[in-house]
Amino acid sequence: TYQRSVNFIFFGNYFVGILAVMLSIEMAFQLGLPLNETVYYIGLFLAPVIYYTYAYKSINDSTPIANQRTRWFRENKKLVHWSQVGMIILCIGIFSFLIFKHFNEIIRLPLIYYSIGFGVLFVGIFYYGLISKKLFGFNLRNSGWTKAFIIGFVWACCANIFPLIMLRIETGQDYFHTDLWVWLFIKNWLFCTVNAIMFDIKDYPSDSNLYLRTFVVSFGLRRTIYFIIVPLLIAGLISFCIFALIKEFSIIQFSFNLIPFLLTLAIAFSMLRRHSIFYYLIVIDGVILVKALCG
């Protein structure tokens, strides 16, 4: 049925995978670059689906039903388990294929490329405390104010930096030679950070009870919107304006790229009222899809 399909796509984090691919394709169009190999985009789709679903691995029949998403994972735990297994195997196969195919190009990459790749990988590992919680007793998911910026940074790296590294591997050309990608990276970093802050609003009651010092817990809902989200959106908009001026965007191009910022601003003010979980999964994440399409 329609509702089951919606639940599967959004609760199962498949929409997140679509967003990762769309943002990466948007970057290529914005910078006028060739697209990456299809197999890379398949791997890019699978990786965030696997990663975001990991947070729900411990849900079982005895887990209290906190919301519709928890209920869906509890009712579909076998489907989730085997789909995770299948996607992990496929993902390993894809990246093994890419390494084998481009081995000579990969080993000739500058050290900075490896630093970026492993840096993002370690942030991802530390975010869920896969290693850090056992060794150091912490994870980045509980890092308070920095949490949203970390999420935004990782998303911006996946959307703007990894595709450029992959293009270097595929073509042998350096696509970091201009400053254009920097302004696009900053815009996406701030945009995705705002998106993460708005998602924290969804978890405001539980984060407050767990003493997680997110922006909304620290400053309250209204101050977070007016003094955190709005300034970050303005900073992201300034970065985009610089990018648009350098690229000499037409009025139509500029106007289309403004739409996601205006939508995000409207959504931010709508957060003054409580909404269902679907509002956060469809509307808030959906604005990232709008951003990719408008780009």
Model region roles, listed by residue range:
Residues Y2-V16, S62-I88, I106-Y113, Y128-F153, ...:
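Interhelical loop and helix-boundary elements at the membrane-water interface
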Residues F8-F29, V85-F95, G152-I161:
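The first (N-terminal) embedded transmembrane alpha-helix
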Residues V21, I25, L44-T63, L121-Y128, ...:
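Central hydrophobic cores of alpha-helical transmembrane segments in multi-pass inner-membrane proteins
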Residues M22-G43, F95-Y114, N160-L184, F240-I252, ...:
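Helix-coil boundary and interhelical linker segments in multi-pass alpha-helical membrane proteins
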Residues L35-Y54, F118-F122, D174-M198:
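Membrane-embedded alpha-helical segments that form the functional core of polytopic membrane enzymes
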Residues S83-I131, I229-S276:
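Transmembrane helix-loop-helix
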